[in-house]
Amino acid sequence: MTNIRKSHPLMKIINNSLIDLPAPSNISSWWNFGSLLGICLALQILTGLFLAMHYTSDTTTAFSSVTHICRDVNYGWVLRYLHANGASMFFICLYLHIGRGLYYGSYLYMETWNVGVILLFAVMATAFMGYVLPWGQMSFWGATVITNLLSAIPYVGTNLVEWIWGGFSVDKATLTRFFAFHFLFPFIISAMVMGHLLFLHETGSNNPTGIPSNMDMIPFHPYYTIKDILGLLVMIMSLLALVLFSPDMLGDPDNYSPANPLNTPPHIKPEWYFLFAYAILRSIPNKLGGVLALVLSILILIIIPLLHTSKQRSMTFRPLSQCMFWLLVADLLALTWIGGQPVEHPYIIIGQLASILYFLIITTLMPLAGLLENRLLKW
């Protein structure tokens, strides 16, 4: 008799994706983040569902309903902080996952990479809309500033912004539709994740050497299930430490004041995971230019496979490219720091230099390093 997991139509899919999947024998812990992202998504959907049972998407009651969740709902505060800090863990895993892809040349699996970039956009949009829902000061002003950027689009900009707002300012209609989309998007993301995995399983996983590993594969279970559980434990412990000891560490104190359209906070800034893009946006004095730079800072990931000049796939044996990669990481950390600082000297010039360097490394320095390494190896 055939094993049910190999014959049942549904079990067969799970078996071929998580149990009998042939995986390279040498993939490191950097390959853990895919499964961690899946768990993050499940956690966000679950905590979000329970929060939505108590939340009201009306400007008069939204802030109070969040307060009610924290004070009166059984373990409501745990749900709320798991959801808020879960988003931070999601982005930490997301950025490390993308960094792994860049370092080891995983972007050469074009379909998987492109679906991943679209996923990144979808997750960022979802997180932004979620930040608006508590209807605190930073929620309101963040929504106003970021949606208002669309008015920079020539000819249709103003109409587009008013259409998104559902009126002439961020108001009740905006909050209601943001809640609707924030609830819907994670399910769309889940469907896209399946596409991401489908494309990945067409080619199989990359590995740290960047060399095809067809001749040396091992089953995913038990080897990588155990390895993923270790990563999961580390992530869950970190998340619980954050939630139970300093739940507000990554939030903004301004968001504990109810939204007031008549009072602008001194420093409007998004959550930490958007600060690098926000710094790039602010570094350009022109509105349209800033918006284009903001979009391109993420969209540039799409063209990375086209900028691959090296004859080796991975950076494991390419010291020059490694230097460029870590310079890019340092630059992104600098941009994140700048994004949280006020717009004044010397932060303005540092932000502008870091923004130029960001685009320069990706479009010029990394491809040049690849070409130079080819020459040094006489390839």
UniProtKB/Swiss-Prot annotation:
Binding site for heme b b566: H97, H196
Species for this entry: Plecotus auritus (Long-eared bat)
Gene Ontology MF annotations: metal ion binding; ubiquinol-cytochrome-c reductase activity
Name by which UniProt lists this protein: Cytochrome b
Keyword Heme tagged: yes
Chief location bin: mitochondrion
Co-factor binding comment: Binds 2 heme b groups non-covalently.
Gene that this sequence comes from: MT-CYB
Binding-site residues, heme b b562: H83, H182
